[in-house]
Amino acid sequence: MSRYRGPRLKIIRRLRNLPGLTNKLVESKKNQASGSDQSIQKKVSQYCIRLEAKQRLRFNYGLTERQLLNYVRIARCAKGSTGQILLQLLEMRLDNILFRLGVVPTIPSARQLINHRHILVNDRIVDVPSFHCKPKDIITIGAPKIYQSIITKRIESFAKDQIPDHLTLSLSEPKKPKGFVNYLINRESIGLKINELLVVEYYSRKA
């Protein structure tokens, strides 16, 4: 299954707000339903609940079905909580790190910067959005002038307290902002509100 490239509002109306996909906020269809409509709604099956959690995770991080399944398989082979390790793997992707640093408004826009070879990790160009960042990595945003003003305005409008503790943003060189990965992200710093156990349960027979 390919990566979704359709209307983003359509997705967040169905799956609720996904900060990585779009910074627009809408009221979900579930919340828009009237009291009489809610009373006649059918009971949602456990499968549908797990499916929705999986879809929220997939669309928020901009993954294909195969990519997410591969991450689940990797998480299963690692020591520790499969759900938490899965979230760590997704959060430590380069495209998501740029998003969490506040350099770009969404993960798709971070992916564009990476694909255009404007991002360096430890002084080496990285053009793979799924690149796995590690503690002590230094990420440099070497965007051309056409992007610099946009990135600067974005950073200025982004509250510093929104940057999670495992990351640090340095503006000592305004034209080349740098991000530092301090340590692996913990569960409390995950930006997406989700029950990761539902995703693990969804893939229990596939991974």
Swiss-Prot record:
Name one process (GO BP) from the record: ribosomal small subunit biogenesis
RNA-binding is among the record's keywords: yes
Q: Where is the S4 RNA-binding domain?
A: 92-153
- Answer yes or no on keyword Plastid: yes
GO CC list: chloroplast; small ribosomal subunit
Any GO MF annotation of the entry: structural constituent of ribosome
The protein's name in its UniProt record: Small ribosomal subunit protein uS4c
Protein's organism: Equisetum bogotense (Horsetail)
Q: Gene encoding it?
A: rps4
